[in-house]
Design a protein with these regions (language model features):
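Lipid interaction determinants
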Residues: 12-129
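Sec-dependent signal peptide recognition
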Residues: 1-2
Length: 129
């Protein structure tokens, strides 16, 4: 325990819910706005390899997980393809991409994944696929 405090970890009892996070997630809301099936981003988390990939509804993306604890989740800069899509799909893709850049925290409950900013505001809500 002394080592944990010295390292600034506060508590060594924090465990990452790897099994709960691992897998494919489908976006249901961005902020308070529901997304439609025609433009529905997905997120694939590989916690063991610290990788993330998915679709923003127009383009595919890939990146890394740079920090993960029992509450914190930070992604690296995401690389995306550069497809041109219908305007409404592009709006979803742009909003999703901007939200992913702000993700700092998460919560998993009842087969839902909530991605939050550093203040705890829910940015993106996913359900397990």
């Amino acid at each position: 325990t002394l080592l944990c405090v010295a390292m600034g970890l506060g508590s060594c009892n924090n465990t990452i819910p790897t099994d709960a996070l691992q897998g494919e997630w489908q976006l249901v809301t961005m902020g308070t706005t529901a997304v439609t099936a025609e433009a529905q981003p997905t997120l694939q988390l590989n916690i063991k390899e610290m990788k993330v990939n998915g679709s923003d509804s127009c383009n595919t993306f890939i990146g890394g997980i740079t920090n993960i604890t029992d509450k914190d989740l930070v992604f690296s800069e995401l690389a995306t393809t550069l497809m041109l899509c219908p305007e409404t799909t592009m709006q979803v893709a742009d909003t999703f991409g901007a939200a992913m850049k702000k993700v700092a925290k998460y919560e998993v409950n009842d087969k839902q994944l909530l991605l939050k900013d550093d203040k705890g505001t829910v940015l993106l809500t996913f359900t397990k696929k």
